Amino acid sequence: MIYNVSYVIFKENLMEFSKTIKELRKRTGLTQQKLAEELGVSLLTVARWEKGQFKPNPTISRMVWEYIEKLGKGYEDLLSGLSNNEQMNIKDMETMLWQAACSIRGEKDAPKFKDYILPLLFIKRLSDVFEDEIARLVKEYGDEKSARKVLEADHSLVRFYIPEEATWPVLSGRKEFKYTDNKTPKTLGEKITNALRLIAKENPSLNGVIDTVDFNATHNGEREISDDALNRLIEKFSNPDYRLGINDVEPDFLGRAYEYLLRKFAESSGQSAGEFFTPQEVGWLIAKIMSPKQGEEIYDPCSGSGGLLVKCQLELLARDGKEKVKKPLKLYGQELTGSSFAIARMNMVVHDMEGEILRGNTMTNPKFQDQSGGLKQFDIVVTNPMWNQDNIDPDFYENDPHERFSSRGGYAPASSADWAWVQHVHASLKPKGRAAIVLDTGAASRGSGSQSENKEKTIRKWFVDNDLIEGVILLPDNLFYNTTAAGIILLINKNKSPERKGKIILINASDEFEKGRPKNYLTESALKKISAAFNSGVEIKKFLKIVSCKEIAEKHDYNISPSRFIETGEAVEHRDIQLILDDIAKIEKEQSKNEQDLKKIFLRLGYKWN
């Protein structure tokens, strides 16, 4: 899917750039030839720009940007049409990241790549942005010396202050730095580690975010990653076409980079790597369905790299327009795995989003609590917990200090904590809160139709009887990297609209996919179709059905699986049995006649037919 999306974005950017060049010529009165001379390019190049046939490289694109800036008032609006084209496109990003990953692939397993690539990518981004901010201060104070003097006195003038020895030119060896008191690093790994720790020291919000990896670490006397491998990584990121400054990449560049690498790690490492990755299309679908409002608090108890939270914020910005968003979302997440926790923190910093990511086991030790020690409650919860988690002691549910389980249908079985996560999510919602939870398909039906007692069905019954389930969406097979199973999105709403009370919206989206390698993916049109259908709540044949909670209880034994109610295939027409028997008799009669004719033929030939 990423390749398809990048192509669309690339084409859209070409058209926007084309309009900008045409408008520039119109306002200046320049001919194509004259503009080409002004910019130092050929007449053919300008002509191709205007036809949307050619996108300039980053160097030329920056030159166009600077030319428009020099024109002054009356031309500033053209910069908005140019900015997207100056930025690295998704395909360029993917190429850069995978080349970097491959450059050290022989030294580290795929799941370990991120421990080294992402912090380096982050420091490159910080350094390039810092350079841009220095340039801004130079314009304001007249020269670089004055600008740096002012900055040394007030670090708050920039987003993040980067000490000289931690800047990318010094790390990459392109600029010399004179270390004092014999503090010259002995290895490149030590140099990088020191730089990351120094940046974190100067910028407290980055503590525990970028300074958690030791690039100089050893195991059994050998370096975990050699200086040669680190140098190869640095050289890949030092390509001038891969600059990561303020206007070089889109705001969510690092978020996209994290997702891309996580996806590639999952592809390379097999199912074991899939646990930290939710397919980005599923995340976008959830964001579109939740449609968060300005100022709302959103929580992910299993936040991973923070992708679901970030997508909610980006969906808000895309829907309302960045300039109209006066109250950003407040994002909260908890994550157990150290590396994913650090990436989630990076994601928040990079996106300049208001939020808090804490580390710990949410099920046994939920960190977000109110002043009285109870669970903090949120407007929206989005999450993709581990499916069928079977390592929770059953006694834990009974002794839970937050009483998340006994009052919400009972205790989940030892074999699967799916509904325990749903119970935690419900306990974390405000009185009018909503939630989207990605679960194993079996969570919708296990225990239904059986005469014996089933703990999951009992909990499911509680949620249905209390009219808390607003919808269930069945996803296509083979989307997730840790399983080929389809998965569902369970939608909880504590405050359903009057027309939806007592009903559940079921969507069978199992056919809404494109084949991919190695996994299937949801198309952009599928995302729009599914989200629009759910939000409208109008029945669609073979796709969306509205079922009453009463019918689900009385006729379906609390089975809420969309596939039980919606068949996507063509209906098979069955013929009347008597007609079938009549046809069989006719065939047998014809067969008997044919046999008699054959007997006569063989007798004339001297053969006896027995």
Task: Pin down the residues of each PLM region.
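A short, Lys/Arg-rich alpha-helix, primarily the initiator
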Residues: 2-27, 184, 202
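The alpha-helix within a helix-turn-helix
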Residues: 25, 36, 65
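Short alpha-helical DNA-recognition segment
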Residues: 29-47
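DNA major-groove recognition helix of helix-turn-helix/homeodomain DNA-binding modules
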Residues: 57-77
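Non-catalytic, mostly N-terminal accessory regions of nucleic-acid modification and defense proteins
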Residues: 80-290, 294, 356-367, 474-477, ...
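Conserved S-adenosyl-L-methionine
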Residues: 272-383, 388-390, 394-399, 405, ...
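A conserved structural/catalytic subdomain of Rossmann-like adenosyl-cofactor enzymes
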Residues: 372-610
